[in-house]
Regions:
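Feature of Fe-S/electron-transfer and energy-metabolism proteins
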Residues: 1-17, 36-40, 56-63, 70-74, ...
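N-terminal flexible segment immediately upstream of the FAD-binding catalytic core
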Residues: 1-70, 87-117, 146, 266-277, ...
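C-terminal substrate-recognition/cap domain of FAD-linked oxidoreductases
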Residues: 32-42, 222-226, 232-399
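ATP-grasp fold ATP-binding core
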Residues: 79-81
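Flexible glycine-/small-residue-rich
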Residues: 103, 181-183, 393-395
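FAD-binding subdomain of flavoenzyme oxidoreductases
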Residues: 108-262
């Protein structure tokens, strides 16, 4: 079946109608429709797929969000909410005859309550900005995606984001108490509550990860946690990638829940080391980063237990961070894996999938086989603790 060509005249007329309807409710700078202005919104972090929207709206208030949605609902124009555009699953990719609704301008931290350990923020607030705002209170926001310096809390809700510490501290779902949002017809609703257990269906869990299809997020109440007194990281090297994968399963089987448990293969560690000089073992076929946090006594005990498991699993080298500076240096390598890939390849396609931990080693071997079969390089980095894989397939889109 041949797909008919798009009706350019009809699309142009629809765009004109939409822009005319939105102009009365938005400032001039908050409504974009010219191609040179909307190109930055043609994709999110999954840059292999691109599509131009009819227009981009950048509201500055919840009321404007509601008015925009009412207009689009009446005109039957699809709306794609967008945070910072760092997502890797195409959740903010536009619809060609739709509107991109950017929440980037709703970026206020509305309140911080150190007694209930909560903060109320708008969706455009950066993930890391929450922790920065409460650092003086000895608190922080636990979910820490690799893009936390740029990603927004609204986008985190839409994708149910995790991060390198999600094994112990959970995903966005486990760290948010309440979400306020707007339905497609403009109705303002709230999901969740400040109570430990609110009556009725758990609609908050349904909204998490829904990519804005159920409601456009306008306000989020997040949980804050106390900073641990101490944190240390083990960097374990393996001369065989299968041993590294099996070590992950062995740590969990031993009843240990590390604060972070990440794995990178040799290609990734080499790319990262050239970029940030994290001190990684460049001869290792795979490295594991295993973090323990808590009181000094708890950390010492857990580090000893993990070291024993790693040695029994065949680790060829073990290095424990000496201080906070070295701990952050170890993590900086993992968190810069994506930009490091961008330095060595013109393009890369990042996969984002989850497998049972027991299959990590097998899958890594399969990926190595496919690299040889198809002649494409691949950097493997993932949240080993929950089996969330991020293979970065390297290519040149110009070929």
């Amino acid at each position: 079946m041949v797909t008919p060509p798009p009706d350019i005249a009809a699309i142009s007329a629809l765009q004109t109608k939409l822009v005319s309807a939105l102009r009365p409710i938005l400032p001039e700078h908050a409504l974009l429709w010219e191609p040179e202005d909307t190109i930055p919104y043609e994709c999110d972090g999954l840059a292999a797929y691109r599509r131009m929207p009819l227009a981009v709206a950048l509201p500055e208030t919840e009321e404007q969000v509601a008015q925009i949605l009412k207009i689009c609902y009446a005109m039957q124009i699809p709306v794609v909410p967008r945070g910072s555009g760092t997502g890797l699953s195409g959740g903010a990719m536009p619809i060609s005859q739709g509107l991109v609704l950017s929440l980037a301008k709703l970026k206020k931290i509305l309140s911080i309550d150190p007694f209930t350990r909560t903060a109320v923020v708008q969706p455009g607030v950066r993930n890391l900005a929450i922790s920065e705002a409460v650092a003086h209170l000895g608190l922080y926001y636990a979910p820490d995606p690799s893009s936390q310096i740029a990603c927004s809390i609204g986008g985190n809700v839409n994708e149910n984001s995790g991060g390198v510490h999600c094994l112990k501290y959970g995903l966005t779902l486990h760290n948010v108490l309440r979400v306020r949002g707007v339905l497609m017809n403009g109705e303002i609703v709230e999901f969740g509550s400040m109570a430990p257990d609110s009556p009725g269906l758990d609609l908050l869990a349904i909204v998490m990860g829904s990519e804005g299809m159920l409601a456009v997020v306008t306000e989020v109440t997040v949980k804050l946690v106390a900073k641990p007194k101490l944190a240390r990281v083990i960097m374990a090297s393996f001369d065989d990638i299968e041993k590294g994968g099996n070590a992950v399963a062995a740590i969990i089987a031993a009843g240990i829940i590390p604060a972070g448990l990440e794995m990178m293969d040799k290609a990734t560690t080499r790319a990262v080391e050239e970029f940030v000089h994290a001190g990684y073992d460049l001869e290792a076929e795979a490295i594991l980063l295993c973090e323990s946090d808590g009181t000094p006594e708890e950390v010492a005990e857990e580090i000893a237990r993990m070291t024993k498991v790693l040695e029994e699993s065949g680790a060829s080298g073990i290095q424990i961070s000496k201080d906070e500076s070295e701990r952050l240096k170890f993590w900086s390598g993992r968190k810069n894996a994506f930009p490091a890939a961008g330095r060595i390849a013109a393009d890369y396609y990042c996969m984002d999938g989850t497998i049972p931990r027991r299959h990590i080693a097998t899958l890594l071997k399969r990926i190595q086989g496919m690299e040889k079969k198809y002649g494409l390089g691949c950097l493997n980095v993932f949240h080993a603790g929950d089996g969330n894989m991020h293979p970065l397939i390297l290519f040149n889109g110009a070929d």
